From Swiss-Prot:
Classification lineage: Eukaryota, Metazoa, Chordata, Craniata, Vertebrata
Single biological process term from Gene Ontology: cell chemotaxis
Species in which this protein is naturally found: Gallus gallus (Chicken)
Protein name: Gallinacin-7
Induction: Induced in the theca layer of the F3 stage ovarian follicle by intravenous injection of LPS. Expression in the kidney and liver is not affected by intravenous injection of LPS.
SUPFAM superfamilies for this protein: Defensin-like
Signal sequence coordinates: 1-19
Disulfide bridge partners, by residue number: C31-C60, C38-C53, C43-C61
Function: Has bactericidal activity.
Length: 67
């Protein structure tokens, strides 16, 4: 009977992959939500700094000038 539970769990994992859903959900990318791009280091022209990236190393930069 234990083998049935193992087969059922493997079946669910396979079906979840087929459905296109990630097995481990990714964290929300806040930089992309703010229409930004992650750059290593600092932002250069024509981009300006709007925050930090999820990895903590890069800068979240947006194109254009602040108004």
């Amino acid at each position: 009977m234990r083998i049935l539970y193992l087969l059922l769990s493997v079946l669910f994992v396979v079906l979840q992959g087929v459905a296109g859903q990630p097995f481990i959900p990714r964290p929300i990318d806040t930089c992309r939500l703010r229409n930004g791009i992650c750059f290593p280091g600092i932002c250069r022209r024509p981009y300006y700094w709007i925050g930090t990236c999820n990895n903590g190393i890069g800068s979240c930069c947006a194109r254009g000038w602040r108004s």
